[in-house]
UniProtKB/Swiss-Prot annotation:
InterPro entries: Motility_Chemotaxis_Reg, Quinoprotein_ADH-like_sf. PANTHER family: CELL SURFACE GLYCOPROTEIN (S-LAYER PROTEIN)-LIKE PROTEIN, PHYTASE-LIKE DOMAIN-CONTAINING PROTEIN. The lineage of its organism: Viruses, Varidnaviria, Bamfordvirae, Nucleocytoviricota, Megaviricetes. Residues 43-94 form a coiled coil. Its main location: virion. Keywords: Coiled coil, Repeat, Virion, WD repeat. It comes from Acanthamoeba polyphaga mimivirus. It comes from the Viruses. WD repeats lie at residues 867-907, 1017-1056, 1115-1156. Residues 304-314, 322-335 have a biased composition (Low complexity). This is Uncharacterized WD repeat-containing protein L264. The keyword Repeat applies.
Length: 1389
């Protein structure tokens, strides 16, 4: 046999599909090897044999899958044939009723099935379910549902069912739904909604519905239910009569904007779980004769038995032919069975559609002029054996039109029934067709594709659809002359993270520029230098973006990082400064010509001065000293992106397309021809002017890349053919005009520089991140807590959903005598500047706990009432997002409230001691919704203060702090006593562990229970963190000499590890020498409480109750502070303050080895940052110094082991040092005290710093990092509005002050690119190129107008945060509307 032919034996009675490159002969599949992929002459025989063996194995695997699947389908078809022959129906979705007459004549319809001709269905989603609401599903029968089942709602439906129960919910039923349903029950109530009632959210609301939910709502509901006020939770009316859940229910109408379910929310769209062509249970309109089966009537759940086929090959060998193109033999044939609606009458011919996939690569050349590639869809179809569209003379007879090409445009399910050429006639259609039809866009939050639906006035002659995002007739000044707008439907399969996903019918590898060669995110591609352009033949359109279809779940939810797409869009009020779109940087109309002239002449000073609101376009230039930011090319185009070059001799495939040079357009864009999706008889070649040069502005629809195209009848446009009605009448002498879909050119531009303009004349902009280190940061939003009346104790953390939890103190009365009269309440504001919660205090000081979502929207509030002397609160979350809060109280009872504002726990007042105050501590656990779980108390007759809390992956809880004077007893959450620690005259450190139920696991201590005061000393545990190496790290200070470390579980056994105090400055207290200069300790414990190692930092460490501190900071704090963070590699980073140098840094064991790293002092008080390895050896150290004081009190790490430190400073200029001693930047202070936040990389290099400042005192008190590596800061400010600055030192946000001290919460994010969006006249898609994603953010701003989201919130810009980040924008005059977004962080004014 010729070596270019391979034989693979197939199974008996199975059918192998073939195309123009494969031939099936006598039970064998013969695969021809392209000549250009023959083994090289220089290959050895062993190499060639190995290659052939790999390919044979690949083919065998693929064929085995195909054979099994095809045989399964044949069995199913044979079964149906036998049933039809016997004139018996099995009542399946594919069966036919014998007659469409009265229901009693059709016995098959008495069972549970989804056949549209059946009137007596007992399951499914039917409008005639009189005993239950139509959108709930059936009221009887144990319906499941399971994927592929006939009954009840399918996955994503609203109902449930509950275990063992009916399909439900129904009147009196238990509370569904399971996850995926639209709303939870009212606490203690049945399943909502009911007519006139609210949706019934879980406490904390609002209800939703979430993506995939059922009811719109139709009307908002704003009354109180069971004492709760659920404003605009809706609905008050039942869902539309048809659907929307189940495979056969489809909502034809769109819920109009403003009806919720959220405040200011836009229209809510129904899920697309399939179309229904007639109402269920209504057979009166059926004609005599067979009921017609309809294409694609089943949902995706029904089609679960039609799996997609794919195979892969590990062979990486390549060969190159003479023309320079290359093909890879690693792309084995993948095929997909897509013709699930094909008539079963033809199955006896054993014809199965088969699409063979290839993978080819194209290398860049140095010819930058050849960057445009035209791809004709017909060439692609020919390659794969598909039929190309044909054009038939309208005068030809109907019989000349192949039936398989005919697809009918519909108008409210009515077509031209009198036309003898009409195929797929609807049995209930009428004789009248619509004269002219437009289709309105339907905003689908569950998919990045656009779905369209017919106008409610479909059979009226209308010019356009009056919808916010409608298919308008004048997007760009051009006119539509067409009867229909395209209808898009979600693809049957969405790409996953794997490039060789079965939903991609063809792939090309295209080598990008060298800027991507340093990509270290190897999880995204086998070859970091490759950029994959997908060509999808499902609907004969081409997908040039490898990222659009990645990382989407089965519900096609683009904002899969968010709980609800519509919950991610929030507005921000303009506070303090007036945001005027007409006169500020973000809304200037800057023409292309003006920008070019300015960029050629502006100097660095002007660039900075004009940067009023923190735009980074010019800031980059100022740092680099460049004056021409955007050099202008010969075509006067602003797109100065590094081009993706494709030479004349390097095409995608010589059999498919030829690459040509188009000199009329931007040389840096890539164009790909697409099939025309508009059904139009005329096409006006009008142009819109984009940035000084003309470019055709397509009046055709803008098709998202990779989106299958369907007609109004939900019939797949498999053959690129559409039928256009030439006349509004339905006279029998008219025949359809069958036309081919004309190719439409899609354009793409690529950006791979740090700063650039986004060209809106191209359809898609693909972004290559140039580097992975972010050196700039911008504020996303800020919110305040008004009338705190104090400036201590605020802490912050984040949970797995990037929600933000803040805890702190507020003072009810600032007068000497407690009084609530005329004292303004503490007010919690959200990021929009709206007061969302008033807190009226009942004591002197109280603890608050506030939870925000990732955009600063208020979720819930809880409080703890008592009297406090040590204003220390700590907060943590576990892996289930439960919230753990700790605090201490003195000589008073404690009242604990949860998010329902109910008193849930009372801790009695300690029995007072006549000689001293008693301070005890507590641990409180709340659920993610703020519902109280349990409390545990640390009981003593002396003092016990918890300073810090953390959790481990098993949801165990660890605390540290100090105790003194008397025995300390640790109580369980049920009130029983557990371990105790012995008494001490002064203070010792305690460490304790609890399980998730609040029961003590072990306790231990650090100190010295000696006979004299000098042996005991003052020792405090200040911070505790869980480490990824399954240990616990504790930091604090001590002046005991020595500090003895004990082991758990009872803290009675010395571990053998101790630390000496280096400082020798002692004072005499009652005859005993006490060391007044403490040392810092670091101790690592195993999770069972046994000590592993300890080390120390020595020097003159600052304690905040000194006279210097009091004069410097007006006595605002008396707390000594040091805090730690653990990075993903288990390294330990510690920060604190010191007032004399040098600081001596010791290594393990037991802090006996002095490291070579020392820090000097500049000014009064400086901040140190020291990094240790997992075993306690110092790696590097750096400092923050200035003429006066710099104090740090918060530290965190991100997913890349970068380090973020927060604090405040009084020096006029504060210098941030890197670990190598360099000083990359400074911050200036123009007030009494300003706050700072600085970021370092893992090596101690300072990357960026920002400040918060007013005319009084501003302090950053704590910092946290969320899962997006965004930075959240909390602090206080007084007397005057607070200004928030970006890292370019431009003020970007301002919040006014309500009282003596207010609190603030601010969220920052850094970025590696600053891109400016230009005005445009057509849809614009922007996406990150996954192969060039550097684990960083890209900033996009718009200056010529505004960007608004679905609820018309005004945005300053947005951040693209992930490898699959993408956004689609629609033009609205001089503004942009966000149509969908995936992994996008919006930036509010």
């Amino acid at each position: 046999m010729n070596r270019n032919i391979r034989r693979v034996r197939r199974e008996v009675d199975s059918y192998i599909p073939s195309n123009n490159v494969n031939v099936e002969t006598e039970g064998y599949l013969i695969r021809r090897i392209p000549k250009k992929c023959k083994p090289k002459v220089t290959s050895t025989i062993a190499q060639r044999v190995s290659q052939l063996e790999n390919e044979v194995a690949e083919i065998n695997v693929a064929l085995a899958e195909h054979v099994n699947e095809l045989n399964s389908q044949e069995k199913r078809i044979d079964k149906l044939e036998k049933t039809v022959k016997k004139k018996k129906s099995n009542c399946s979705d594919d069966s036919e009723c014998s007659e469409c007459s009265e229901c009693s004549e059709r016995s098959c319809c008495s069972k549970c099935n989804s056949n549209k001709c059946c009137c007596n269905n007992t399951c499914g989603v039917f409008p005639n379910s009189v005993e239950a609401f139509s959108y709930y599903g059936p009221i009887s029968g144990n319906c499941g549902p399971f994927p592929g089942g006939n009954c009840g709602p399918f996955p994503g439906g609203p109902c449930g069912p509950f275990a063992g129960g009916n399909c439900g919910p129904f009147s009196g039923g238990s509370c569904g739904p399971f996850p995926g349903g639209p709303c939870g029950p009212i606490p203690g109530g049945n399943c909502g909604p009911i007519p006139g009632g609210p949706c019934g959210p879980i406490s904390g609301g609002p209800c939703g519905p979430i993506s995939g939910g059922s009811c719109g709502p139709a009307l908002p509901y704003s009354a109180a239910v069971d004492g709760y006020e659920y404003f605009q939770n809706g609905p008050m009316m039942s869902c539309p009569p048809i659907g929307p859940m189940g495979p056969n229910g489809f909502v034809e109408e769109q819920f109009v904007g403003g009806n919720g379910p959220f405040i200011g929310g836009g229209g809510f769209i129904g899920p697309n779980n399939g179309f229904v062509e007639e109402s269920w249970g209504n057979c009166n309109d059926c004609r005599r004769g067979k009921c017609k089966k309809h294409k694609n009537r089943r949902s995706k759940s029904d089609n679960s038995d039609l799996s997609e086929y794919s195979s892969s090959n590990s062979d990486d060998s390549e060969c190159t032919d003479s023309d320079g193109s290359s093909c890879s033999t690693d792309g084995s044939p993948d095929c997909t069975e897509s013709e699930n609606t094909e008539s079963h009458r033809s199955h006896g011919k054993k014809k199965h559609r088969f699409v063979n996939k290839k993978r080819n690569t194209c290398n860049n050349s140095d010819n930058k002029d050849n960057s445009r590639i035209n791809m004709n869809i017909c060439d692609l179809l020919k390659l794969f054996g598909d039929k190309c569209p044909i054009k038939i003379d309208p005068n030809e007879e109907c019989k000349q039109v192949p039936n398989e090409f005919i697809q009918i445009k519909c108008c409210q399910e009515q077509i031209c029934c009198q036309n003898s050429c009409c195929a797929n006639k609807n049995s209930c259609c009428t004789d009248n067709c619509c004269p002219k039809t437009k289709c309105c866009e339907k905003d689908d939050t569950n998919s990045y594709t656009i779905e369209w639906q017919k106008s409610p006035d479909c059979c009226k002659e209308i010019d356009y659809c009056e919808k916010p995002f409608s298919c308008e007739t004048n997007y760009c000044g051009n006119s539509y002359e067409t009867d229909y707008c395209p209808i898009y439907i979600k693809p049957d399969s969405i790409n996953s993270n794997n490039y060789t996903n079965s939903s991609e019918k063809y792939q090309y590898n295209h080598y990008d520029s060298d800027n991507c060669s340093d990509n270290y995110s190897d999880n995204y591609s086998d070859n970091d230098s490759e950029k994959v352009y997908n060509i999808n033949l499902d609907a004969t359109n081409i997908n040039t973006d490898p990222n659009y279809n990645h990382n989407f779940n089965n519900n096609h939810n683009f904002n899969n990082n968010f709980t609800n797409n519509r919950m991610t869009d929030y507005s921000t009020d303009y506070i303090s400064h007036n945001f005027n779109p007409g006169n500020n940087q973000y809304s200037q109309q800057i023409s292309h010509e003006q920008n070019i002239n300015q960029q050629q002449s502006q100097n660095s000073e002007n660039l900075l001065d004009n940067n009023e609101y923190g735009d980074y376009e010019n800031y980059y230039n100022m740092l680099r000293g460049d004056q021409n930011i955007f050099p202008v090319n010969n075509s006067s185009n602003f797109n100065q992106y590094e081009s993706t070059d494709i030479s004349n001799n390097q095409n995608f495939n010589s059999q498919i397309v030829d690459s040509i040079i188009d000199t009329n357009h931007n040389k840096d864009s890539i164009q790909v021809e697409f099939s025309n999706n508009n059904d139009k008889t005329h096409h006006e070649k009008n142009e819109c002017h984009c940035h000084e040069h003309s470019q055709p502005c397509k009046t055709t629809s803008i098709v998202p890349f990779g989106t299958p195209i369907v007609d109004c009848n939900n019939c797949r446009n498999e053959e690129c053919i559409t039928i256009i009605q030439t006349d509004s009448s339905c006279s029998s002498n008219k025949v359809p005009i069958i036309q081919p879909i004309e190719p439409e050119t899609k354009t793409m531009s690529i950006i791979d520089t740090a700063i650039a303009n986004i060209d809106t004349c191209t359809d898609l902009t693909l972004i290559n991140q140039p580097k992975g280190i972010s050196t700039d940061a911008a504020i996303l939003w800020a919110a305040k807590i008004g009338n705190l009346n104090m400036n201590q104790g605020m802490k912050v953390t984040t949970d797995s959903n990037n929600n933000i939890i803040v805890a702190g103190f507020y003072r009810a009365d600032v007068t000497p005598e407690p009084s609530n009269d005329d004292v303004p309440p503490t007010v919690i504001y959200d990021s929009k500047g709206c007061g969302v919660k008033n807190i009226t205090a009942s004591g002197i000081e109280e603890i608050f706990i506030v939870k925000y979502d990732m955009y600063g929207n208020f979720l819930w509030f809880a409080k703890i009432e008592s009297t406090f002397t040590d204003f220390t609160v700590s907060i943590a979350v576990d892996t289930e997002d439960n919230v753990i809060v700790t605090g201490s109280f003195t000589d008073s009872a404690v009242n604990i409230y949860d998010s329902t504002s109910q008193l849930v726990k009372h801790i009695p007042q300690p029995i007072p001691e006549p000689s001293a105050e008693i301070t005890q501590s507590f641990i409180v656990k709340y659920s993610p919704a703020g519902i109280y779980q349990w409390t545990a108390v640390l009981f003593t007759s002396g003092i016990a203060v918890i300073k810090s809390v953390t959790t481990d992956p098993n949801n165990n809880i660890y605390i540290t702090g100090y105790y003194g004077g008397q025995t300390l007893t640790f109580q369980n959450s049920d009130g029983t006593d557990s371990y105790s620690l012995g008494a001490n005259s002064l203070t010792n450190v305690f460490v304790a562990a609890y399980n998730y139920l609040g029961f003590v696991l072990w306790v231990t201590m650090c100190g010295n229970i000696g006979n004299t005061v000098s042996e005991q000393g003052y020792n405090e545990g200040l911070d505790i963190k869980y480490s990824p190496d399954q240990t616990i790290v504790v930091s604090g200070y001590y002046n005991t000499n020595p500090l003895i470390i004990y082991d758990g579980p009872d803290g009675l056994t010395p571990s053998g590890i101790s630390l000496t105090n280096v400082n020798n400055t002692n004072i005499n207290i009652t005859g005993n020498d006490i060391n007044t200069t403490p040392d810092i300790f670091l101790i690592k414990f195993r999770l069972n409480g046994t000590a592993l190692w300890a080390t120390k930092i020595s020097g003159t460490i600052t304690q905040f109750n000194t006279s210097v501190w009091a004069s410097e900071f007006s006595g605002i704090s008396n707390q000594f502070y040091t805090t730690i963070a653990i990075d993903p590699d288990a390294n330990i980073i510690i920060t604190g303050t010191y007032n004399q140098g040098p600081v001596q840094i010791f290594n393990t064991p037991s802090g006996t080895i002095l490291s070579t790293i020392n820090l000097i002092i500049t000014g009064t008080i400086s901040t140190y940052i020291i990094k240790y390895g997992p075993r306690g050896n110092a790696i590097w150290a750096t400092r923050i110094s200035g003429a006066l004081s710099q104090v740090s009190n918060g530290i965190a790490t991100d997913s890349d082991s970068n380090i973020i430190v927060s604090g405040y400073f009084s020096a006029p200029v504060t210098v941030f040092y890197s670990s190598d001693g360099t000083t990359p930047f400074t911050l200036e202070n123009v007030s009494e005290i300003s706050a700072f936040t600085v970021k370092y990389d893992r090596c101690g290099n300072a990357l960026w710093a920002v400040k918060q400042e007013n005319n009084g005192i501003t302090q950053a008190l704590n910092v946290a990092v969320d899962n997006n590596d965004s930075v959240v800061i909390v602090g206080t400010f007084n007397q005057a509005p607070i200004n928030f600055y970006n890292s370019n030192k431009q003020m970007a946000k301002c919040i006014i002050n309500d009282s003596s001290y207010d609190g603030y919460v601010a969220k920052y994010a850094d970025f590696v690119q600053s891109l400016v969006l230009l005005p445009g006249c057509k849809q614009k898609d922007i996406a990150i190129n996954e192969s060039c994603y550097k684990r960083a953010n890209t900033l996009v701003t718009y200056k010529a107008g505004t960007i608004s989201n679905s609820v018309s919130n005004c945005l300053r810009g947005f951040l693209m945060t992930r490898a699959n980040s993408s956004i689609k924008l629609l033009p609205n005059g001089n503004n942009w509307l966000v149509d969908y977004s995936n992994n996008i962080l919006f930036i509010y004014p």
